Amino acid sequence: CSVYSWAVIIEKFRLFKKINKLSEEFEEKFWNSKSAENFYNSLPTNVEDPMALVFQGAMEGLLKKKSKTNLSERMTAMLEAGVEKQMTKIEKGFTFLATVGSTAPFIGLFGTVWGIMNSFQSIAISRNTSLAIVAPGIAEALFATALGLLAAIPAVVAYNKFNTDSQKYSQKLE
């Protein structure tokens, strides 16, 4: 769980770094172009930038429809659909991070209870409360707690950061 969590964190970190750079380049080229149609025609077919993909989808819809009726409504609908599609791709994996962040401490707590129960069981079997009898169960309990926190803390921090980054990027797209 923790390994996959770190894989998602690294992938999202790289993704946000990439799309922020691409969107800055897109905006600069867009505002320096003579017209939206000229800019659309200059875009490569294999665009990776979500902002460019939203623009491309809206322009394709605009250019394919010759009718000028309800143009504003159609453009709004196409842009909203494009933004939603790109944000769904960007936010993939967020639910996993949130789930790990919220459940890992409970799994660690379960391990803690299990370790404490083992300590009590050792005391009952040996009828002795020396450190040598109690320590293995306590160590097991602390280890389980640490593992739960080790999985949860990075997942929660990453989820919050990426959720904030996602909201900011969504506002840029809109």
What are the language-model segments listed below?
Residues 17-111, 116-130, 157-174:
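Predominantly long cytosolic amphipathic alpha-helical stalk/bundle segments
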Residues 94-98, 138, 145:
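Short hydrophobic "helix-edge" motifs at membrane interfaces and signal-peptide entry regions
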Residues 12, 105-108, 148:
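Residue-level detector of functionally special positions within alpha-helical transmembrane segments
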Residues 1-12:
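Hydrophobic alpha-helical transmembrane segments
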